[in-house]
Amino acid sequence: AAVPTAKPATSKDIQGATQTGTPTFEGATVQVNGQDKAITIKDNSYTLLDKDGNEVATTPAYAEDGTTEIGTYSIDPATGQVTFTPTDKSYTGKVTPVKVQAESSNGIKVDTTYTPEIVPVTPTATPAETTDIQGATQTGKPEFKGGTVTVDGVEKTVEINDDVPATFDDGSTTKTVDGVGTYTVAADGTVTFTPEKSFTGKAPAVTVVREDKNGTKASATYTPTVT
């Protein structure tokens, strides 16, 4: 019998990104009564196989451990293109492959795999310091930047999520240190320090936390000095 061939597909992209891959299925040629006869891949026969081997259009995607659900796979039955959509955007690394199947015009089903890989991205943060005279209110803003990695020669960035307000490292937005002063952090990460009138010297640092659009956090300190 003429058996079609199947070659797996892989893809790699940054944390949080939707990925696609299209395994290659090819028909075969068989001789019938001295004549070459083409065996083709049947139209709209592309399908996924779930964990139990059932033909499905969508199926959960699992982490490398094979049990933790981290996204979904779906397939275009006309083209065989598989889409991986992450739902747990904190996960990075290899994803358990999904089985992809097609059927030949002579009714033979063959399958192969599609395997996405997720490259981790971590935001960066730079501390801030300010100095002012006794009694003066000071403001400082640690700098947060989305992490950037290069995937297959292309630079990709996960931006800081401006919809999630900055906080201090304990989740609060206001801190008071007796005998020193009060710190408040704004949504954009700007810290306002209001010193006690009698305080001079270097005040304790406070840690500001922000996160990117995958929920990956970064932190940096702000340190005011009163002269």
Descriptions of predicted regions:
Residues 4-6, 44-48, 70-75, 123-125, ...:
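Generic structural motif
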Residues 58-59, 64-112, 173-220:
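Acidic, turn/loop-rich segments in luminal/extracellular domains of secretory-pathway
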Residues 25-26, 46-48, 104, 144, ...:
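Aromatic-residue detector
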Residues 15, 48-49, 81, 134:
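Generic detector of leucine side chains in alpha-helical contexts
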Residues 1-38, 97-156, 205, 213-227:
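Extracellular interdomain linkers/hinges and stalk-like, low-complexity segments
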Residues 40-42, 76, 109, 119, ...:
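Residues marking helix boundaries in flexible regions
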Residues 28, 51-52, 94, 121, ...:
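Low-complexity, intrinsically disordered/propeptide-like segments
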